[in-house]
Swiss-Prot record:
Pathway: Purine metabolism; GMP biosynthesis; GMP from XMP (L-Gln route): step 1/1. This is GMP synthase [glutamine-hydrolyzing]. The active site is at 86 (nucleophile), 181, 183. Catalyzes the synthesis of GMP from XMP. It comes from Sodalis glossinidius (strain morsitans). ATP binds at residues 235-241. It catalyses: XMP + L-glutamine + ATP + H2O = GMP + L-glutamate + AMP + diphosphate + 2 H(+). Residues 9-207 form the Glutamine amidotransferase type-1 domain.
Length: 525
């Protein structure tokens, strides 16, 4: 019998902050399971979840507006600790009898908080000591409204020069509010505060560890599928690879993986996937060579969205044919991860995250009555990688830069042709190889090469050449929502350019993309 790793759990109510998923990841990093729900949950749902504590997230709304989101009243009646963050603190204050008002002075960015009153939330946690001997905390603020009167039975724990109620607390009920964001790294002691709340105040035991998550997932897979067979579309990406390894550990040869070589992969990627998972790990894999089929379907198409849809449609067709040929398979496995679940959750209020369609497999034929196995659906990407390491997958594979689902189909601008893909594959391989050799690969968040469907004059020896152009792209980012172009050394860029032009017949010019996001996107299409 496996240990119940969900026994201690934190409920995070989402009021729309861009940082809400970060709160959940920080709680998970403490070894405690948590779930992220829209703010408009019912009392019955909270009771059923049975949280050890509740966190109210930040959000863009103003609590001074009549129709702005509110926490369910039951949150404050459940008898568990509650932590309100930014907007979460404001709605807590207002709902419990305090006052909030709009401020003419927004507080955004770094602030120093002075601790005035002892509180378990921040006891012995400080960045510095003020002139009067009071502990000081370096925090990250992002708010317009602020609490102007705290509820009865609360005390002011900390203040800034412009925000008198920076931390408030009702120690008896274990209710706490912080006007800043402890989940961001700019709040230097933020993780210690979250640790204090989750482990000490909520009394959670850290059970959410990679080894225990694997043990739990294996047990659940075995219970779900019994002695049945399972099919999985294996791409070689992080999510499908970790899903494959979990399923293989749980059911062994009763897993069949389908690897579709669409001709839009990186250099030698198809052979590497087959060698790693087939030869090395001993998984049962069907390799489907489908380059001609994909390229034929893409012929004459230059619109990026149409290309994406075409690639998705053909993949579904190819995968379905393989699935139908395996008559005894009763389960379909997918590498759905927790952010997919969050983003796909429609909320009647419209406050939930943007709805996103899954691109894992798409719609299977109606005649196929298959159950769905999603062993990663509770996990964030960083957790999936840690589990992959625990399962024995190589670090370089798990922490490789992101690669788009449509592959080179959206890195060849305009119409996709085999000639263009072959040139791009080789150019990209040189760029990545040089990044590794210069110890730069792990210092940038994403790097790749783009094929431009324009010809440029070049000189090779005594001759003139008129060949294609590629663009190098490297960015630095924390969350991929915004990004800066990477300031790679000139001599490095020169070396990459020389190698590409000299070693690849068909490319005459190399450029470097120095666009940030915004206004540009990271991928060109």
């Amino acid at each position: 019998m496996t240990e119940n790793i969900h026994k201690h759990r934190i409920l995070i109510l989402d009021f729309g902050s861009q940082y809400t998923q970060l709160v959940a990841r920080r709680v998970r990093e403490l070894g405690v399971y948590c779930e992220l729900w829209a703010w408009d949950v019912t009392e019955a749902q909270i009771r059923e979840f049975n949280p050890s504590g509740i966190i109210l997230s930040g959000g863009p709304e103003s609590t001074t507006e009549q129709d702005s989101p509110r926490a369910p009243d039951y949150v404050f009646q459940a008898g568990v600790p509650v932590l309100g963050v930014c907007y979460g603190m404001q709605t807590m204050a207002m709902q419990l009898g305090g006052k909030v008002q709009g401020s003419t002075q927004r507080e955004f960015g770094y602030a120093q908080v002075e601790v005035l009153t002892d509180s378990l939330l921040v006891r012995d946690i400080q960045d510095d000591i003020g002139t009067g001997g009071a502990p000081l905390l370096d925090v990250w603020m992002s708010h317009g409204d602020k609490v102007t009167a705290i509820p009865a039975d609360f005390v002011t724990v900390a203040s800034t020069e412009t925000c008198h109620f920076a931390i408030m607390a009702n120690e008896e009920k274990r209710f706490y509010g912080v006007q800043f964001h402890p989940e961001v790294t700019h709040t230097r002691q933020g993780q210690r505060m979250l640790e204090r709340f989750v482990l000490d105040i909520c009394r959670c035991t850290p059970l959410w560890t990679p080894a225990k998550i694997i043990e739990d997932a294996v047990a659940r897979i075995r219970e779900q599928v019994g002695n049945d067979r399972v099919i999985l579309g294996l791409s070689g990406g992080v999510d499908s690879s970790v899903t494959a390894m979990l399923l293989h550990r749980a059911i062994g040869e009763r897993l069949t993986c389908v690897f579709v070589d669409n001709g839009l992969l990186r250099l030698n990627e198809a052979s590497q996937v087959m060698e790693m998972f087939g030869d090395h790990y001993g998984l049962n894999i069907i390799a489907v060579p489908a380059e001609d089929r994909f390229l034929s379907a893409l012929a004459g198409i230059d619109d990026p969205e149409t290309k994406r849809k075409t690639i998705g449609r053909v993949f579904v067709e190819v995968f379905d044919e393989q699935a139908l040929s395996l008559s005894d398979v009763k389960w379909l496995a997918q590498g759905t991860i927790y952010p997919d679940v969050i983003e796909s959750a429609a909320s009647a209020t419209g406050k939930a995250h943007v709805i996103k369609s899954h691109h894992n497999v798409g719609g299977l034929p109606k005649e196929m009555k298959m159950g769905l196995v999603e062993p990663l659906k509770e996990l964030f990407k960083d957790e999936v990688r840690k589990i992959g390491l625990e399962l024995g997958l190589p670090y370089d594979m798990l922490y490789r830069h992101p690669f788009p689902g449509p592959g080179l189909g959206v890195r060849v601008l305009g119409e996709v042709k085999k000639e263009y893909c072959d040139l791009l594959r080789r150019a990209d391989a040189i760029f990545i190889e040089e990044l590794y050799k210069a110890d730069l690969y792990n210092k940038v968040s994403q790097a790749f090469t783009v094929f431009l469907p324009v010809r440029s004059v070049g000189v090779m020896g005594d001759g003139r050449k008129y060949d294609w152009v590629v663009s190098l792209r490297a960015v630095e980012t924390i969350d991929f929502m915004t990004a800066h172009w990477a300031h790679l050394p000139y001599d490095f860029l020169g070396r990459v350019s020389n190698r590409i032009i000299n070693e690849i017949d068909g490319i005459s010019r190399v450029v470097y993309d120095i666009s940030g996001k915004p206004p540009a996107t990271i991928e060109w299409e």
